[in-house]
Structure formats: C-alpha cells, structure tokens
Amino acid sequence: MDNTLQKIGVVGCGLMGAGIAEVCARAGSDVIVVESNQERADAGRGRLEKSLRRAEERGRLDSADEVLGRIRVVTELGDLADRDMVVEAILEDEGAKVELFKQLDEIVTSPDAILASNTSSIPIMKLATVTKRPSNVLGVHFFNPVPVLKLVELVPSLMTADETVERARTYVDGELGKHAITCQDRAGFVVNSLLIPFILSAIRMYESGFATAEDIDQGFVLGAAHPQGPLALADLIGLDTTMAVAESLYAEFKEQLYAPPPLLQRMVDAGLMGRKSGRGFYTYDS
C-alpha cells in the first residue's frame, strides 16, 4: 500500500471546506472540491480566490495562481473516485452526513482511501458503520479559520485502523504543518466538549440580563487574556453550528451544561447566525 496522501477530495466549499481545500493545495496536494450546484461552486471558487489573493498580498504566499491551479471546484461526487482521502465538510446534520458517506463508499475506488469527516460533534462510529470500509473512516476536525489555526483533532472510531490514524497524522503534521491530537469518539471531542459549555454559560448570562454582550466579552479579553470573548466567538463559529454541537452533546450526555439556552434557539430560528448572516450577538457589515 502507498501510504502517501496526494490526491485530496473535499465535499463542501463553505467556510470550512474552502479552508481545508486551501491548506491542502498550499501544501502541494491535488485537490478536488465538490459543491451541490454550480452557483455554490462559483461562490466557493470565489471564496478560495479571495483568501489566496489576500495571503499573496500579505506576503504569506508566493503565488496564488499556482495554488489555485491545484484546485478544481466541481458539482459531481463522481469526480472524487480516484482520491486518496476525502474530507466531508457539509452542514452539521447527521442524516445528511450518513447519506453522503454511503455515497462516498460506493464512489471512491481505492480500498485504502480514507473517508474523513470534519464534523465538530457527531460520533464517527455513526458514519463508519454505513460504509464497507469502517477501518478507513476517521474524524479529521479542523478549526476556523483553517489557514490560521494549527490544531486538528483526529477522531478514530472503535473500528478505525491504527494505520489509518497514522497516515492522517503524517499528512496533517508533515504536509500541512499543523498539530494533530487524538481524542476518543464521543460527541464534541476535546475542544468543543470544553468550549461549548463555556459559550452556553455566556449566552445564559446575557439572556438573564446579568451583563451586556460587550461587558461579558471584555471580561474575558481583558481579565482572562482571551483573544476574543465567548459571544463574539459564537458569532464567528456560527450560532447554528453552536446550536447543532450543543444539541449533539446534550443528546449523548444528558447533562444540563450542554442544553442549548432558549435565546440561542430563538436566534437560530430567526436566521441570526452570527458573522455569516450579518447579525448575531453583534451586527456586522456585509
């Protein structure tokens, strides 16, 4: 078996998918990104171009065009047939991810190819068991913004082969220049199991009228040396994503600290998703 991962596929070209595609292409990999329709594909391509041009202008990249030349954005999952690893980066919806993994299992031809998920909360076992290659299914969870943050969580299920984990680790650490940690296959993994209760506590404090959003956030920026406060961070993550992760954690552990506050549910229902919608706990310019 050739253990190297050279041909990478990414499903989804939103904020996370585009970031994953960018860092893989910047590392020299051949990357194919799949979006659900041409409009989304064009938007994803534009997102990649904007990010890479900005990196070039800031002197962090020699040639944006060279990196863009290693990325194809398409609309057919079948184009992923020859990939060494495919990273799923679609919406945080268990049913949608399960269906996608069923399709990828039929499409990706190499029996050694890794099928990876960028899920931030869904147990990997639920995705692995719908494939005929559960030993090659792994969580590979990047953090937003992907080109900036170094951490990647590697999440093997009980059925993931040790060799699969090590191949992914070699790529993440060696090729991408990031730092991989390994964590158990439980909802939220390491970072979100700690982060989400912190954010939810801040939302409850704001909801109760205990303090303003600005004062809550400034308390942690100026008093705890955090780069940003919990409510601004929730806006950056996306309130819909924060809600989905909280629901997944609460469903698995039934602990009150993971229960989404009513205000968070109302904001998501109203379409107030944070930065990506222009309004969350703060208002943002388009």
Residue ranges and their predicted role:
Residues M1-S51:
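NAD(P)+-binding Rossmann beta1-loop-alpha1 motif at the extreme N-terminus of oxidoreductases
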Residues D2-T4, S29, E163-E166, D173-Q184, ...:
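NAD(P)-dependent Rossmann-like dehydrogenase/reductase catalytic/cofactor-binding core
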Residues I8, R26, D65-M85, R167-G177, ...:
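Amphipathic alpha-helical segments at domain termini/boundaries
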Residues I32, R72, V87, L138-V140, ...:
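Hydrophobic/aromatic beta-strand patches that form the interior of the parallel beta-sheet core
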Residues V33-D65, P156-T164, A180, A187-L194:
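Rossmann-like dinucleotide-binding cores of NAD(P)H-dependent redox enzymes
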Residues E39-R40, R54-I114, I122:
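Rossmann-like NAD(P)-binding element
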Residues I114-Q184, N192-S193:
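Rossmann-fold dinucleotide-binding core
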